[in-house]
Amino acid sequence: MSNLKIMGPALPDMPWEERPAGSKEVMWRYSANPIIGRDALSTSNSVFNSAVVPFKKGKYNYAGVFRCDDTNRRMRIHAGFSVDGIDWDIREEDFKLVGGDAEIGQWVYGYDPRVAKIGDKYYVCLLYTSP
């Protein structure tokens, strides 16, 4: 396990903690969890940071999509942006999906969002029912 290698471009400003002493885990939790409080939004009961990518725009270096359960436990998706990957500005308004297929924009369920950069575009997906 002493020969770990991160694949991808260098992210020198990415927050990082060394592996805890004695740990043999491939991945480990940040010692100051949770990064985002459960009441980060005016309507949130809980917030889950499912997907974050490097994103250079204005002052921001990171962007993410977050599952934010409201106080009625409805799962909604919200966009957020961060300078340092620790302190987040999460948008109050729900994230809207758009695409060439009208079905993409239909709201079903805000669960487990993911984001990826492919080429020069960012793609977001979440729970999607299959046939």
Regions picked out by a protein language model, each given a short descriptive name:
Residues 48-50, 62, 80:
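Structural detector for hydrophobic anchor residues on beta-strands
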